[in-house]
Regions:
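Positively charged, solvent-exposed patches that mediate nucleic-acid binding
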Residues: 1-121
Length: 121
């Protein structure tokens, strides 16, 4: 699972990507151009928990929940996607199973999960 690191990449995804909301988390997905030789072939994941998600302990827990849920779903995600998960306040009080269901549902709704033929979106 590759990480989105730079502020420029996060800003590009937030500006140009499509957003999908769930009560626990928001997903912003952006398909990278397939001909970009500077980008890795796999999908990249970024995790954000702003101050609206609670105190630092709650924000860190929310990001841990999101990372673990995304790690479990990463093999199903097609290549070439930049995905940013934004934690909402109720996520910090949620269980791992609830976070996993939310992430998996958002990935399906965004059509970034590979289907039976191995293609995504």
């Amino acid at each position: 699972m590759l990480g989105l690191k730079s502020a420029i990449d996060f800003e590009r995804v937030r500006r140009d990507g499509r957003s999908h909301a769930h009560p626990l988390v928001v997903l912003i997905a952006l398909r990278r151009p397939p001909t970009d030789p500077l980008q890795p072939a796999g999908s990249r994941f970024g995790f954000v928990a702003g101050k609206g998600a609670g105190i630092a302990v709650a924000r860190n827990r929310a990001k841990r929940l999101l990372r673990e849920a995304a790690r479990a779903c990463a093999p199903e995600v097609g290549p070439g996607w930049d995905l940013v998960f934004i934690a909402r306040k109720p996520l910090a009080a949620a269980r791992q199973a609830e976070a996993s269901v939310a992430v998996r549902g958002l990935l399906r709704r965004a059509q970034v999960v590979r289907d039976e033929q191995g293609t995504a979106g």
